[in-house]
Amino acid sequence: MVDLKRLRQEPEVFHRAIREKGVALDLEALLALDREVQELKKRLQEVQTERNQVAKRVPKAPPEEKEALIARGKALGEEAKRLEEALREKEARLEALLLQVPLPPWPGAPVGGEEANREIKRVGGPPEFSFPPLDHVALMEKNGWWEPRISQVSGSRSYALKGDLALYELALLRFAMDFMARRGFLPMTLPSYAREKAFLGTGHFPAYRDQVWAIAETDLYLTGTAEVVLNALHSGEILPYEALPLRYAGYAPAFRSEAGSFGKDVRGLMRVHQFHKVEQYVLTEASLEASDRAFQELLENAEEILRLLELPYRLVEVATGDMGPGKWRQVDIEVYLPSEGRYRETHSCSALLDWQARRANLRYRDPEGRVRYAYTLNNTALATPRILAMLLENHQLQDGRVRVPQALIPYMGKEVLEPCG
């Protein structure tokens, strides 16, 4: 959510943000509704003040005036009730519209849609094979590493790993948590579900509600990232300045409905309903300097993980129309997938300034004693099984086995993933 005072003072800034981010929102209608709310508040205050004055006069009023004062007080009470009802209705409508207002992006963001995304860095390059390489599905089938019957049990976009590949997935998650702990982040294991308020706090609702599965007959929803839970942990608190920044590494199984992705990545591990994710999350003081420092830290953590996994990757500056409505800046990391001959997204590093903090009521007390909204940031540390597809394809050997990166050998106890059976 944006600062309403700033929205009133600088509407042109938000008109531009709405246009550049492609958000369907009538800002003039929102501002008109805001003016109506302000007028209702003013009138309600006037009515309540007069009603209090009338109530004070009644006991001391002469008999010939008392009846009229009582009638006036009753009329004012009825008017106050009508105004309160109208105010509640309009405030609810205004709140719903404010949740849709995007954060203006940083000046360095390319303007446009996905086609305007700009590569800013590349590390490594496509692997060179002396043999015809296999895609990750063929490698799993050749080595007996996945269970094809799982679609009969759990439907499409499900997966089940076996043998060394199952252990490899678990090893990767532990490797990522250990790495983040060494970097000073607090490791946390978290639920895969949360109440609606938490999704509103991150901005997943209302914008991405169709990507989220509801748990029937409850007020809970399945999370697609630990960010949803982490962002809600300190809701309503006023944190001491000395506690900042808060740096969490949260692990949770994640779920996405993949609505709108019909026909995309139907084979293999690239797009599944349930996956596993270690998420980086930072809550820091409200300054661009602090946010920029945290952003670079989150980005460097993810890059170092990919270097340790010995994977070729690139950084992409995300354009205004491709980033989320709450993003100040977004840089995606993409890893090369040999079978497709292109880079595919594995990480998304985001700075959201106070957009989430206002929605989730995340505050701190600054050194001058003022209560302020914090800034939040997040980035993937590692997510499986998508990263497994990259590891299998980039590290495959001529005999169909797959080598283990040096950093993962202590977790696996071997240098090569062996076939099942």
UniProtKB/Swiss-Prot annotation:
Keyword presence, Lyase: no
InterPro entries: aa-tRNA-synt_IIb, aa-tRNA-synth_II, aa-tRNA-synth_II/BPL/LPL, Ser-tRNA-ligase_type_1, Ser-tRNA-synth_1_N, SerRS_1_N_sf, SerRS_core, tRNA-bd_arm
Entry EC no(s): 6.1.1.11
Gene Ontology biological process terms in this record: selenocysteine biosynthetic process; seryl-tRNA aminoacylation
Pathway: Aminoacyl-tRNA biosynthesis; selenocysteinyl-tRNA(Sec) biosynthesis; L-seryl-tRNA(Sec) from L-serine and tRNA(Sec): step 1/1
Keywords in alphabetical order: Aminoacyl-tRNA synthetase, ATP-binding, Cytoplasm, Ligase, Nucleotide-binding, Protein biosynthesis
SUPFAM superfamilies associated with the record: Class II aaRS and biotin synthetases, tRNA-binding arm
List of residues binding L-serine: T225, A226, E227, E279, T380
Annotated Gene Ontology cellular component terms: cytoplasm
Subcellular location: Cytoplasm
Chain residues that bind ATP: R256, S257, E258, V272, E345, T346, H347, S348
GO molecular function, a single term: tRNA binding
A Pfam family: tRNA-synt_2b
Keyword Translocase found: no
This protein's domain notes: Consists of two distinct domains, a catalytic core and a N-terminal extension that is involved in tRNA binding.
Its biological purpose: Catalyzes the attachment of serine to tRNA(Ser). Is also probably able to aminoacylate tRNA(Sec) with serine, to form the misacylated tRNA L-seryl-tRNA(Sec), which will be further converted into selenocysteinyl-tRNA(Sec).
Subunit structure, as described in the record: Homodimer. A single tRNA molecule binds across the dimer.
Family: Belongs to the class-II aminoacyl-tRNA synthetase family. Type-1 seryl-tRNA synthetase subfamily.
Family annotation (HAMAP family): Ser_tRNA_synth_type1
Designated name of the protein: Serine--tRNA ligase
Lineage: Bacteria, Thermotogati, Deinococcota, Deinococci, Thermales
